[in-house]
Amino acid sequence: MSKKTFEVMLVGSVMALAAQAHAAEPAGTLIGALSSCQKGFFDAVEAKHDALSKIATVQRHAGGTAFIEVTGRAKEDASFVRFSAPYQDADVPLIGYFDEVRDIGTLGKYYSWGFVVQGKVDDIAKQATPRLAEAKRVRAAEGVYVRSDLWRNGHWQDDDQLAGNTAPAPGTVERVLLIEDAGPEFSGAVRIGCSLQGSVTPAMLATERPDI
């Protein structure tokens, strides 16, 4: 075999292996897309529209996005939908979706959205963390896992010191990724979700919550 023939075969083998490796890469997960707490999550819901439509009502929205519908965002007893069957997001079983909007008076608006997952907080956090945006910033605090940002002076800033019991200052917005126990109404389950709280503007909703 000539050197030239061997080199051609070698290049072909490398290209084939690269193609196989690319084909084997897992598709992006919904949890991973959600964790950015931005518009990309709703793009991901659109991309998985057909699969999600089999277990929940999924509405398409202008701009190539989609969202999972709940009966009423502003009503506590209507802001959650349980899937007709679990959705396996890689190795994380999603059993429902929540979408909450609350008016908190002088403190502004509170928006919260995400998934309810079967499992325990520490276990789900361990499974999900490798897929999370800015995973190194996710911290454990009092039984929950959190990553927090603050909108101030016209842009988002990392703020790993945000305290959950302190209201946002006027003119600011907190954006939080939270992994927490889902509460007594969902025994043995965990909430993985995002929230916006404070002086949320229409312009901000357009980039973070285009479904509203």
Question: What do the predicted segments below correspond to?
Answer:
Residues 1-5:
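Positively charged n-region of N-terminal signal peptides that target proteins for export
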Residues 8-16:
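Bacterial N-terminal signal peptides
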Residues 17-24, 52, 115, 129, ...:
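Intrinsic disorder/low-complexity segments
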Residues 20-32, 97-111, 168-198:
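Short, surface-exposed loop and linker segments with low hydrophobicity and enrichment for Pro/Ser/Thr
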Residues 22-113:
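Short helix/turn-capping signatures at newly exposed starts of structured segments
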Residues 68-75, 81, 115-117, 166-167, ...:
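Short beta-strand element of the conserved SAM-dependent methyltransferase core
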Residues 83-162:
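Long, charged/polar, surface-exposed segments that mediate recognition or autoinhibition
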Residues 130-212:
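Non-cytosolic coordination micro-motifs
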